């Protein structure tokens, strides 16, 4: 394992993305989102993914110079065409716009279509939390999960995230599959076995082999209930925003598909929490947080560091394999 300072990791990721053609501001935002995942301990969505993004940038699957193109612009609803750009900076921008408009209109939603993978979805509810708002986020990806009772992958891991301005903030961040696919990839790189019940082979047989799982399918979280929530996420992203469904999204882990745009869609909603109360009180969020603590529990995501306030001196850990891949890319891109 290798240990890096957060500030150094962000600089490295920013430099690599810039060398691959991404403008400085978008590269810096993307790098911070990537490293925030590692800082949260979600290495499967952090620097481990950067070599895959770089490969796709070089092959043409990701447009380094992408710009958000406005499709719909209403007071409480904005939709952008992402122009095949990196999902991180695009979803961060979407969350900031949703937050700004919700503070004026009470609620706002922003969709981004024709985008790419955005990393850990929970990062993008923090622009809302930091403004005292409620945030909800959805995203799609390649089909890896069959419909309930089916034998073909039609749904992505269909992640959903939510942020509530409690003290400390509540951050819900989960895939509706039994496990995020990035964790399967991390297990495959490490040569480790999967937990039983996570995945199936391409023929539908249960497997604990990570490589078989990558070529196969993932189980839904909580059985039919997880499947139902996955359908909801797919509805709010691929079906309604588009331009494509999960079954047609290229696999970022397949080098043979690097040149194919993923055309992923994201959707965020911001709600002004101060406007929701029927009695004018805003104390119940903190009251609940205190009750959870008194009961011996903790709120979901209570230990998550605010991604907009990362400490450059903090440390993250990456595998030796990821460290070697980043060094290889640095040499390849002349850094």
Predicted segment positions?
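A generic, well-ordered mixed alpha/beta core segment in the N-terminal half of proteins
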Residues: 78-167
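Catalytic-core signal marking the mid-to-C-terminal active-site face
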Residues: 3-4, 9-12, 19, 244-335
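Glycine-rich phosphate/pyrophosphate-binding loops
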Residues: 133-144, 238-254
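Small-residue-enriched flexible segments
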Residues: 181-242, 259
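N-terminal glycine-rich anion-binding loops that anchor highly charged ligand groups
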Residues: 2-5, 22-48, 62-73, 261-263, ...
